[in-house]
UniProtKB/Swiss-Prot annotation:
One Gene Ontology cellular component annotation held by this UniProt entry: plasma membrane
Pathway where this protein functions: Glycolipid biosynthesis; lipid IV(A) biosynthesis; lipid IV(A) from (3R)-3-hydroxytetradecanoyl-[acyl-carrier-protein] and UDP-N-acetyl-alpha-D-glucosamine: step 6/6
Family annotation (NCBIfam families): PRK00652.1-5
InterPro entries for this protein: LpxK
EC number annotated for this UniProt entry: 2.7.1.130
Cell wall biogenesis/degradation as UniProt keyword: no
Species of the source: Campylobacter concisus (strain 13826)
Protein name, entry field: Tetraacyldisaccharide 4'-kinase
Length: 306
C-alpha cells in the first residue's frame, strides 16, 4: 500500500514541478511563504560557510534543482576523459552507513544495495574506477587524497559550501516550470545561484548525449526509476507502455514480472541506473545506453582544473 502511494505521489510531484495544471500553479503560489523561508535558510547557509582547501583539485558536478539533470553521465564522461579521479558521492538510498569504498582501481567491493545505484554505475562504467560513498564528504576526500587521487570528482557537491572546489552546475532539460524554491518549485537553491557556478553545463552546447537501445525486442515496456522520466520521451513510441517509479526505487523481481505479464511485453526497457539493480533477476532487459561527449570548450576548462 505504501509503495503504491509513493509511486502516485512521485507521479503527481513530477507533474507539479514540470507540467503543472492551473490548480497546481495555484497551490505553488499558496506555498510561497514556505518557499521564502526555505530560500532564506539556504542563503544563510551559503554565506555563513567557511571554505576549506584540502590541497587537492576538487571538481563538483551539481545542479540547483531536484534530480534529473544528467549529472551522473556527465561525471562518467569527465572521469573517462581525465584519469586519476576518485569519485565521491553520498550514495543515496544505499543500505550501508558511513564511508564505504565501492570500487578500488576497478575492483568492485560492494553490491548495489550497499553502494546505491549511482555509485554502481560509476564502478561498472569507468575503467580502473575509484568510487567512494560517504555522508561526510570531507572524510572521503581525505581518504582519497591519502590513497593517490589525482583529483576528486564530487557528484552533487554544490551544496558543500564549506569545501573549496570548482563548481560545475548542470542546467536541466527540460527545466522546471516555476523558478521557485521548494515547496513552490523544484529548485533546491535559488535560480540566482547559477552565478556562483564556475562553469554552467548545458546539454547540446557544452556536452552532447547519444543514446541507443541494446537488445531491442518487439514489445518493450519502459520501466524506470529516475527523477525526470520525461527525459526518455524519445523512446515512448517504441514501447507498449511506460511505468514510472520514484527516483532510486528498489525494484522487486515479482513486480517487474507482473508488469511484463500485464503489458504482454517481451522485455523491460530500462536505463543503466535501473539495470544495475535488476541485472541478477534473470528477466529479459533491453538497455538504454547513454554516452556523453564533451565540447572542446568544456575540455579546455576541465584541463585547467585537473
Amino acid at each position: 500500500m505504501f509503495k503504491k502511494f509513493n509511486i502516485l505521489l512521485h507521479s503527481w510531484a513530477n507533474d507539479y514541478f514540470f507540467r503543472p495544471n492551473f490548480f497546481q500553479i495555484l497551490l505553488a503560489f499558496l506555498l510561497l511563504p514556505l518557499s521564502l523561508i526555505y530560500t532564506l535558510v539556504v542563503v544563510c547557509k551559503k554565506f555563513s560557510a567557511q571554505k576549506k582547501d584540502f590541497g587537492i583539485k576538487i571538481i563538483s558536478v551539481g545542479n540547483l534543482t531536484l534530480g534529473g539533470s544528467g549529472k551522473t553521465p556527465l561525471c562518467v564522461a569527465i572521469a573517462k576523459n581525465y584519469g586519476g579521479a576518485f569519485i565521491i558521492l553520498r550514495g543515496y538510498k544505499r543500505k550501508s552507513k558511513g564511508m564505504q569504498v565501492v570500487a578500488r582501481n576497478g575492483e568492485i567491493l560492494l553490491d548495489v544495495a550497499a553502494s546505491g545505484d549511482e555509485a554502481m554505475i560509476y564502478a561498472t562504467s569507468i575503467k580502473n574506477a575509484n568510487v567512494i560513498v560517504s555522508e561526510d564528504r570531507k572524510i572521503a576526500i581525505n581518504y582519497a587524497k591519502k590513497h593517490g587521487a589525482k583529483y576528486i570528482l564530487l557528484d552533487d557537491g554544490f551544496s558543500k559550501f564549506d569545501i573549496a572546489k570548482f563548481d560545475i552546475l548542470v542546467r536541466p532539460n527540460p527545466e522546471p516550470k516555476l523558478r521557485l524554491c521548494l515547496p513552490s518549485g523544484a529548485y533546491r537553491y535559488p535560480f540566482s545561484f547559477y552565478k556562483f557556478g564556475n562553469f554552467i553545463a548545458c546539454e547540446g552546447q557544452t556536452h552532447f548525449r547519444k543514446s541507443e537501445i541494446l537488445n531491442k525486442t518487439e514489445k518493450m515496456v519502459l520501466v524506470t526509476a529516475i527523477a525526470n522520466p520525461a527525459r526518455l520521451e524519445a523512446f515512448f513510441s517504441e514501447c507498449v507502455g511506460q511505468v514510472f517509479f520514484p527516483d532510486h526505487y528498489d525494484f522487486s523481481k515479482e513486480e517487474l514480472s507482473e508488469i511484463l505479464q500485464s503489458y504482454g511485453a517481451t522485455s523491460l526497457l530500462m536505463t543503466q541506473k535501473d539495470y544495475v539493480k535488476v541485472k541478477d533477476f534473470g528477466l529479459r532487459v533491453s538497455l538504454i545506453t547513454l554516452e556523453v561527449t564533451l565540447s572542446e570548450e568544456f575540455k579546455k576548462v576541465l584541463a585547467k582544473q585537473i
